Amino acid sequence: MNKITEDLQNEVQWELENNILPFWMNRMIDNEYGGFHGQITGNGQRVVHAPKGAILNARILWTFSAAYRLLRKPEYLETATRAKRYLIDKFYDQEFEGIYWELDYTGQPVQTKKQIYALGFAIYGLSEYNRATGDKEALDYAIRLFKAIEQYSFDPEKNGYMAVSYTHLRAHETLRHL
């Protein structure tokens, strides 16, 4: 590795460990209702009663899982585990499979349609958590979500995937194909 590449790598890692990850750990964890706050204002104020989105939670899960896998810091594992638990316990629809698009600030489903986009991000997060920890539960849920995408989004006639949403095991085609 040449000096410029090494310096850039060190600078990026410093920024990640001293600014980016601490921001999420110190400002966005919701200790009252679980998971993570769903919104922060431009001047850094948490919006305590903002809804919580599946994409944000899944991205936090992936980010802290990958950070733990690479850097092995226990606080990253703790944050990743918090995100995994919240995703499975609150966002996952145990009855009809899939990930709710949005919860209210207390963790109750608000938008119960399952967007394939959210399922994809949940798979990324859960599979990275499994990769970092070997956690079988995360892998099992990632596989379940993959099967839901195959069941509700694959279009064998066009041999591709539709951007669909479903609520109760009924797929509804949206305006575009992936």
Predicted regions: what they are:
Residues 1-10, 59-74, 121-135:
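Well-ordered alpha-helical scaffold segments within catalytic/enzyme domains
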Residues 5, 9, 13, 43-59, ...:
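Solvent-exposed loop and edge beta-strand segments that line ligand/cofactor-binding
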Residues 14, 51-54, 74-81, 113-120, ...:
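Non-membrane alpha-helical structural segments and their capping/turn regions in soluble enzymes
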Residues 39, 98-113, 160-169:
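Aspartate-rich (DDxxD/NDxxD/DxxxD) Mg2+/diphosphate-binding motifs
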Residues 167-177:
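Conserved small/polar residues in nucleotide/adenosyl-binding loops
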